[in-house]
Regions:
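Gly/serine-rich nucleotide phosphate-binding loop at the start of the catalytic core
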Residues: 1-76
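Well-ordered beta-strand positions in beta-sheet-rich domains
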Residues: 4-8, 150, 180
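Generic detection of short hydrophobic beta-strand segments and adjacent strand-loop junctions
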Residues: 7-9, 135-138, 199-201
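Acidic carboxylate diad motif detector
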Residues: 52-156
Length: 367
Protein backbone atom coordinates (compact mmCIF):
# COMPACT_ATOMS: atom_id res chain seq x y z
CA UNK A 1 0.00 0.00 0.00
CA UNK A 2 1.17 3.52 -0.83
CA UNK A 3 0.91 6.10 1.97
CA UNK A 4 2.12 9.70 2.04
CA UNK A 5 3.73 11.29 5.11
CA UNK A 6 3.84 15.08 5.07
CA UNK A 7 6.48 17.03 7.02
CA UNK A 8 7.28 20.70 7.33
CA UNK A 9 10.83 21.51 6.21
CA UNK A 10 13.08 24.47 7.02
CA UNK A 11 15.48 24.97 4.08
CA UNK A 12 18.43 27.35 4.45
CA UNK A 13 18.95 30.27 2.04
CA UNK A 14 20.90 28.17 -0.51
CA UNK A 15 18.31 25.41 -0.42
CA UNK A 16 15.47 27.93 -0.83
CA UNK A 17 17.19 29.28 -3.97
CA UNK A 18 17.52 25.74 -5.38
CA UNK A 19 13.87 24.95 -4.58
CA UNK A 20 12.75 28.19 -6.28
CA UNK A 21 14.86 27.29 -9.34
CA UNK A 22 13.27 23.84 -9.47
CA UNK A 23 9.75 25.30 -9.20
CA UNK A 24 10.55 27.70 -12.05
CA UNK A 25 12.16 25.07 -14.30
CA UNK A 26 9.33 22.58 -13.75
CA UNK A 27 6.82 25.29 -14.64
CA UNK A 28 8.87 26.21 -17.73
CA UNK A 29 9.09 22.58 -18.92
CA UNK A 30 5.38 22.03 -18.23
CA UNK A 31 4.47 25.09 -20.33
CA UNK A 32 6.95 24.35 -23.13
CA UNK A 33 5.85 20.72 -23.56
CA UNK A 34 2.18 21.78 -23.39
CA UNK A 35 2.85 24.33 -26.17
CA UNK A 36 4.77 21.65 -28.15
CA UNK A 37 1.87 19.23 -27.83
CA UNK A 38 -0.62 21.88 -28.95
CA UNK A 39 1.59 22.86 -31.89
CA UNK A 40 2.04 19.29 -33.18
CA UNK A 41 -1.67 18.59 -32.90
CA UNK A 42 -2.54 21.91 -34.60
CA UNK A 43 -0.21 21.25 -37.55
CA UNK A 44 -0.43 17.48 -38.00
CA UNK A 45 -3.56 16.47 -36.04
CA UNK A 46 -1.26 13.98 -34.36
CA UNK A 47 -1.36 13.00 -30.70
CA UNK A 48 1.89 13.38 -28.75
CA UNK A 49 2.68 10.95 -25.92
CA UNK A 50 4.38 11.81 -22.64
CA UNK A 51 7.45 9.88 -23.87
CA UNK A 52 7.60 12.12 -26.97
CA UNK A 53 7.36 15.19 -24.73
CA UNK A 54 10.11 13.84 -22.47
CA UNK A 55 12.35 13.22 -25.50
CA UNK A 56 11.61 16.76 -26.73
CA UNK A 57 12.71 18.11 -23.34
CA UNK A 58 15.95 16.09 -23.29
CA UNK A 59 16.94 16.69 -26.93
CA UNK A 60 15.70 20.22 -27.58
CA UNK A 61 14.94 22.14 -24.39
CA UNK A 62 18.04 21.08 -22.43
CA UNK A 63 20.16 21.89 -25.48
CA UNK A 64 18.68 25.39 -25.88
CA UNK A 65 18.36 26.14 -22.16
CA UNK A 66 21.52 24.90 -20.41
CA UNK A 67 20.25 25.92 -16.97
CA UNK A 68 17.71 23.07 -17.07
CA UNK A 69 20.64 20.69 -16.49
CA UNK A 70 21.14 22.21 -13.02
CA UNK A 71 17.77 20.79 -11.94
CA UNK A 72 16.93 17.28 -10.74
CA UNK A 73 15.98 15.34 -13.90
CA UNK A 74 13.16 13.43 -12.17
CA UNK A 75 11.46 16.71 -11.21
CA UNK A 76 11.38 17.78 -14.87
CA UNK A 77 10.12 14.36 -16.03
CA UNK A 78 7.34 14.42 -13.43
CA UNK A 79 6.33 17.93 -14.57
CA UNK A 80 5.85 16.47 -18.07
CA UNK A 81 3.90 13.51 -16.67
CA UNK A 82 1.67 15.93 -14.72
CA UNK A 83 0.96 17.80 -17.95
CA UNK A 84 0.08 14.49 -19.64
CA UNK A 85 -2.19 13.54 -16.70
CA UNK A 86 -4.04 16.86 -17.14
CA UNK A 87 -4.53 15.98 -20.83
CA UNK A 88 -5.82 12.49 -20.00
CA UNK A 89 -8.24 13.98 -17.46
CA UNK A 90 -9.51 16.40 -20.11
CA UNK A 91 -10.31 13.56 -22.53
CA UNK A 92 -11.49 10.90 -20.07
CA UNK A 93 -13.23 12.92 -17.35
CA UNK A 94 -14.20 16.01 -19.39
CA UNK A 95 -12.18 18.28 -17.10
CA UNK A 96 -11.00 21.69 -18.33
CA UNK A 97 -8.39 21.89 -21.10
CA UNK A 98 -4.84 22.05 -19.61
CA UNK A 99 -3.74 25.62 -18.92
CA UNK A 100 -0.29 27.17 -18.83
CA UNK A 101 1.12 27.56 -15.33
CA UNK A 102 1.84 31.01 -13.92
CA UNK A 103 4.72 32.02 -11.65
CA UNK A 104 2.10 33.83 -9.55
CA UNK A 105 0.34 30.59 -8.56
CA UNK A 106 -0.10 30.41 -4.78
CA UNK A 107 0.84 26.74 -4.48
CA UNK A 108 4.11 25.55 -6.00
CA UNK A 109 5.44 21.99 -5.99
CA UNK A 110 7.66 19.45 -7.70
CA UNK A 111 8.05 15.67 -7.35
CA UNK A 112 11.26 13.64 -7.48
CA UNK A 113 11.65 9.86 -7.55
CA UNK A 114 13.66 7.60 -5.26
CA UNK A 115 16.73 5.95 -6.77
CA UNK A 116 20.03 4.77 -5.27
CA UNK A 117 19.30 6.28 -1.85
CA UNK A 118 18.86 9.85 -3.14
CA UNK A 119 15.94 10.38 -0.71
CA UNK A 120 16.33 9.48 2.97
CA UNK A 121 14.64 10.45 6.24
CA UNK A 122 16.78 10.53 9.40
CA UNK A 123 14.49 10.61 12.45
CA UNK A 124 17.44 10.89 14.85
CA UNK A 125 18.90 14.09 13.39
CA UNK A 126 15.55 15.49 12.18
CA UNK A 127 16.72 15.89 8.59
CA UNK A 128 15.57 14.75 5.15
CA UNK A 129 18.02 14.10 2.31
CA UNK A 130 16.68 15.29 -1.06
CA UNK A 131 18.26 15.42 -4.57
CA UNK A 132 20.21 18.66 -5.21
CA UNK A 133 19.37 19.90 -1.67
CA UNK A 134 21.33 17.44 0.48
CA UNK A 135 20.12 17.40 4.12
CA UNK A 136 17.16 19.66 4.89
CA UNK A 137 16.03 20.38 8.45
CA UNK A 138 12.52 19.01 9.06
CA UNK A 139 9.89 18.57 11.76
CA UNK A 140 9.56 14.77 11.75
CA UNK A 141 6.49 14.31 13.96
CA UNK A 142 5.49 10.88 12.56
CA UNK A 143 7.64 7.82 11.93
CA UNK A 144 6.96 5.22 9.23
CA UNK A 145 8.34 1.95 7.96
CA UNK A 146 8.61 0.92 4.33
CA UNK A 147 10.28 1.73 1.02
CA UNK A 148 10.36 5.36 -0.16
CA UNK A 149 8.96 5.77 -3.70
CA UNK A 150 9.03 9.55 -4.21
CA UNK A 151 9.09 12.96 -2.51
CA UNK A 152 7.03 16.05 -3.33
CA UNK A 153 8.42 19.41 -2.20
CA UNK A 154 5.86 22.22 -1.97
CA UNK A 155 5.53 25.83 -0.87
CA UNK A 156 2.13 27.19 0.17
CA UNK A 157 0.87 30.77 -0.04
CA UNK A 158 1.96 31.53 3.55
CA UNK A 159 5.58 30.87 2.50
CA UNK A 160 5.98 27.60 4.43
CA UNK A 161 7.74 24.62 2.86
CA UNK A 162 6.63 21.00 3.08
CA UNK A 163 7.77 17.63 1.78
CA UNK A 164 5.43 14.69 1.24
CA UNK A 165 7.20 11.31 1.34
CA UNK A 166 5.38 8.55 -0.57
CA UNK A 167 6.09 5.16 1.00
CA UNK A 168 5.27 1.56 0.05
CA UNK A 169 4.20 0.15 3.39
CA UNK A 170 2.00 -2.49 5.00
CA UNK A 171 -1.25 -1.44 6.64
CA UNK A 172 -2.89 -3.49 9.38
CA UNK A 173 -6.65 -3.55 8.87
CA UNK A 174 -8.99 -2.72 11.74
CA UNK A 175 -10.80 -5.60 13.46
CA UNK A 176 -14.13 -6.65 11.94
CA UNK A 177 -17.27 -5.16 13.50
CA UNK A 178 -20.95 -6.05 13.05
CA UNK A 179 -22.20 -2.48 13.30
CA UNK A 180 -23.42 -0.59 10.20
CA UNK A 181 -24.27 3.10 9.85
CA UNK A 182 -26.07 5.54 7.59
CA UNK A 183 -24.93 9.17 7.33
CA UNK A 184 -27.04 12.20 6.48
CA UNK A 185 -24.78 15.09 5.46
CA UNK A 186 -26.01 18.44 6.71
CA UNK A 187 -25.27 22.17 6.68
CA UNK A 188 -26.10 23.17 10.27
CA UNK A 189 -24.21 20.08 11.45
CA UNK A 190 -21.50 18.24 9.53
CA UNK A 191 -23.42 14.96 9.56
CA UNK A 192 -26.00 12.98 11.53
CA UNK A 193 -25.84 9.19 11.84
CA UNK A 194 -28.58 6.57 11.85
CA UNK A 195 -27.90 5.83 15.54
CA UNK A 196 -28.57 9.47 16.44
CA UNK A 197 -25.01 10.79 16.80
CA UNK A 198 -24.52 14.39 15.66
CA UNK A 199 -21.12 15.58 14.43
CA UNK A 200 -21.30 19.34 14.80
CA UNK A 201 -19.47 21.88 12.67
CA UNK A 202 -16.48 23.39 14.45
CA UNK A 203 -17.32 26.68 16.16
CA UNK A 204 -13.67 27.75 16.45
CA UNK A 205 -13.54 28.25 12.67
CA UNK A 206 -15.96 31.19 13.06
CA UNK A 207 -13.31 32.94 15.18
CA UNK A 208 -10.72 32.68 12.39
CA UNK A 209 -13.26 33.63 9.73
CA UNK A 210 -13.88 36.89 11.64
CA UNK A 211 -10.11 37.49 11.71
CA UNK A 212 -10.03 36.81 7.97
CA UNK A 213 -12.72 39.39 7.23
CA UNK A 214 -10.86 41.96 9.35
CA UNK A 215 -7.55 41.28 7.56
CA UNK A 216 -9.17 41.43 4.11
CA UNK A 217 -10.68 44.79 5.04
CA UNK A 218 -7.23 46.01 6.14
CA UNK A 219 -5.69 44.77 2.88
CA UNK A 220 -8.15 46.82 0.82
CA UNK A 221 -6.77 49.98 2.48
CA UNK A 222 -3.09 49.17 1.88
CA UNK A 223 -1.15 50.55 -1.07
CA UNK A 224 -0.62 47.77 -3.62
CA UNK A 225 2.89 46.26 -3.62
CA UNK A 226 3.81 48.17 -0.45
CA UNK A 227 5.56 46.34 2.42
CA UNK A 228 2.45 46.51 4.59
CA UNK A 229 0.36 45.14 1.69
CA UNK A 230 2.53 42.02 1.48
CA UNK A 231 2.66 41.66 5.28
CA UNK A 232 -1.14 41.69 5.47
CA UNK A 233 -1.38 39.34 2.49
CA UNK A 234 0.85 36.85 4.31
CA UNK A 235 -1.33 37.13 7.44
CA UNK A 236 -4.38 36.33 5.28
CA UNK A 237 -2.60 33.28 3.81
CA UNK A 238 -1.70 32.08 7.33
CA UNK A 239 -5.31 32.54 8.46
CA UNK A 240 -6.60 30.55 5.46
CA UNK A 241 -4.04 27.84 6.25
CA UNK A 242 -5.12 27.72 9.90
CA UNK A 243 -8.79 27.29 8.92
CA UNK A 244 -7.90 24.62 6.35
CA UNK A 245 -5.74 22.66 8.83
CA UNK A 246 -8.30 22.80 11.66
CA UNK A 247 -11.06 21.63 9.32
CA UNK A 248 -8.99 18.82 7.80
CA UNK A 249 -7.82 17.60 11.21
CA UNK A 250 -11.43 17.48 12.45
CA UNK A 251 -12.58 15.60 9.33
CA UNK A 252 -9.80 13.04 9.84
CA UNK A 253 -10.96 12.47 13.43
CA UNK A 254 -14.61 12.11 12.38
CA UNK A 255 -13.86 9.77 9.46
CA UNK A 256 -11.50 7.66 11.61
CA UNK A 257 -14.18 7.24 14.29
CA UNK A 258 -16.87 6.30 11.74
CA UNK A 259 -14.59 3.79 9.97
CA UNK A 260 -13.34 2.28 13.26
CA UNK A 261 -16.81 1.64 14.65
CA UNK A 262 -18.69 0.44 11.54
CA UNK A 263 -18.35 -2.29 8.92
CA UNK A 264 -20.75 -0.82 6.34
CA UNK A 265 -21.00 2.96 5.92
CA UNK A 266 -23.66 4.49 3.66
CA UNK A 267 -24.09 8.11 2.55
CA UNK A 268 -25.73 10.02 -0.28
CA UNK A 269 -23.83 10.63 -3.51
CA UNK A 270 -24.34 14.40 -3.46
CA UNK A 271 -23.65 16.38 -6.64
CA UNK A 272 -21.68 19.09 -4.84
CA UNK A 273 -20.63 20.93 -8.03
CA UNK A 274 -24.28 21.47 -8.93
CA UNK A 275 -25.31 22.35 -5.38
CA UNK A 276 -22.75 25.16 -4.99
CA UNK A 277 -24.35 26.89 -7.97
CA UNK A 278 -27.03 27.95 -5.48
CA UNK A 279 -25.45 31.23 -4.30
CA UNK A 280 -27.45 31.20 -1.06
CA UNK A 281 -25.96 27.86 0.01
CA UNK A 282 -22.58 27.84 -1.79
CA UNK A 283 -20.47 29.09 1.15
CA UNK A 284 -22.24 26.89 3.69
CA UNK A 285 -21.76 23.80 1.50
CA UNK A 286 -18.09 24.61 0.89
CA UNK A 287 -17.50 25.25 4.60
CA UNK A 288 -18.83 21.86 5.75
CA UNK A 289 -16.48 20.07 3.31
CA UNK A 290 -18.75 17.18 2.29
CA UNK A 291 -16.42 16.21 -0.55
CA UNK A 292 -13.38 15.91 1.73
CA UNK A 293 -15.30 13.89 4.33
CA UNK A 294 -16.63 11.41 1.74
CA UNK A 295 -13.17 11.20 0.10
CA UNK A 296 -11.61 10.27 3.45
CA UNK A 297 -14.33 7.72 4.19
CA UNK A 298 -13.81 6.15 0.77
CA UNK A 299 -10.06 5.56 1.00
CA UNK A 300 -10.09 4.66 4.70
CA UNK A 301 -12.80 2.06 4.03
CA UNK A 302 -10.58 0.49 1.33
CA UNK A 303 -7.58 0.46 3.67
CA UNK A 304 -9.49 -1.24 6.48
CA UNK A 305 -11.67 -3.80 4.71
CA UNK A 306 -14.85 -1.77 5.23
CA UNK A 307 -17.61 -1.21 2.67
CA UNK A 308 -18.51 2.39 1.82
CA UNK A 309 -21.61 2.87 -0.32
CA UNK A 310 -23.01 6.02 -1.92
CA UNK A 311 -26.71 5.87 -2.77
CA UNK A 312 -28.50 7.85 -5.48
CA UNK A 313 -28.72 11.62 -4.96
CA UNK A 314 -32.46 11.62 -5.67
CA UNK A 315 -33.36 8.89 -3.19
CA UNK A 316 -36.18 10.36 -1.02
CA UNK A 317 -34.45 9.68 2.31
CA UNK A 318 -36.11 12.62 4.12
CA UNK A 319 -39.64 11.78 2.97
CA UNK A 320 -39.84 8.08 3.88
CA UNK A 321 -40.85 6.74 7.28
CA UNK A 322 -37.97 4.51 8.40
CA UNK A 323 -40.44 2.26 10.28
CA UNK A 324 -43.19 1.52 7.73
CA UNK A 325 -41.92 3.08 4.47
CA UNK A 326 -44.77 5.61 4.08
CA UNK A 327 -43.74 8.58 1.88
CA UNK A 328 -44.76 11.89 3.44
CA UNK A 329 -44.84 14.76 0.87
CA UNK A 330 -45.04 17.37 3.67
CA UNK A 331 -41.35 16.80 4.48
CA UNK A 332 -40.34 18.39 1.17
CA UNK A 333 -40.57 21.60 3.20
CA UNK A 334 -37.09 21.94 4.74
CA UNK A 335 -38.49 23.80 7.75
CA UNK A 336 -40.15 20.55 8.92
CA UNK A 337 -37.57 19.22 11.39
CA UNK A 338 -39.76 16.67 13.23
CA UNK A 339 -42.86 14.81 12.06
CA UNK A 340 -45.24 11.99 12.96
CA UNK A 341 -45.95 9.28 10.38
CA UNK A 342 -49.69 9.42 9.44
CA UNK A 343 -49.65 5.67 8.76
CA UNK A 344 -47.86 4.06 11.74
CA UNK A 345 -47.63 6.97 14.20
CA UNK A 346 -43.84 6.82 14.54
CA UNK A 347 -42.20 10.10 15.63
CA UNK A 348 -39.21 11.20 13.55
CA UNK A 349 -36.34 13.65 13.73
CA UNK A 350 -35.86 14.66 10.09
CA UNK A 351 -32.09 14.06 9.91
CA UNK A 352 -31.91 10.85 11.98
CA UNK A 353 -34.82 9.38 10.01
CA UNK A 354 -33.05 10.28 6.73
CA UNK A 355 -29.85 8.59 7.95
CA UNK A 356 -31.82 5.43 8.85
CA UNK A 357 -33.37 5.35 5.36
CA UNK A 358 -29.94 5.89 3.76
CA UNK A 359 -28.59 2.89 5.70
CA UNK A 360 -31.59 0.72 4.72
CA UNK A 361 -31.16 1.59 1.03
CA UNK A 362 -27.41 0.91 1.14
CA UNK A 363 -27.89 -2.49 2.78
CA UNK A 364 -30.61 -3.33 0.24
CA UNK A 365 -28.16 -2.65 -2.60
CA UNK A 366 -25.56 -5.10 -1.27
CA UNK A 367 -28.01 -7.77 -0.08
Amino acid sequence: MLKAYKYRIYPNSGQRIQIAKTFGCCRFVYNQTLAYRREIYGKEKKSVSKTDCNNYCNRELKKDYEWLKEIDKFALTNAIYNMDAAYQKFFKEHAGYPKFKSKHDNHKSYTTNFTNGNIAVDFETGKIKLPKLKAVKARLHREYSGQIKSATVSQVSSGKYYVSILVETEHKELAHTNHNIGIDLGIKDLCITSDGKVYENLKIIKKYEKQLVKLQRQLSHKGKRSKNYYKTKKKIALCHEKIRNIRKDYLHKVSHEIISENQVIVSENLQIKNMVKNHHLAKAISDVSWYELTRQLEYKAKWNGRKYIKIDTFYASSQLCSVCGYQNPDTKDLSVRTWICPKCGAEHDRDINAAKNILTEGLRQIA
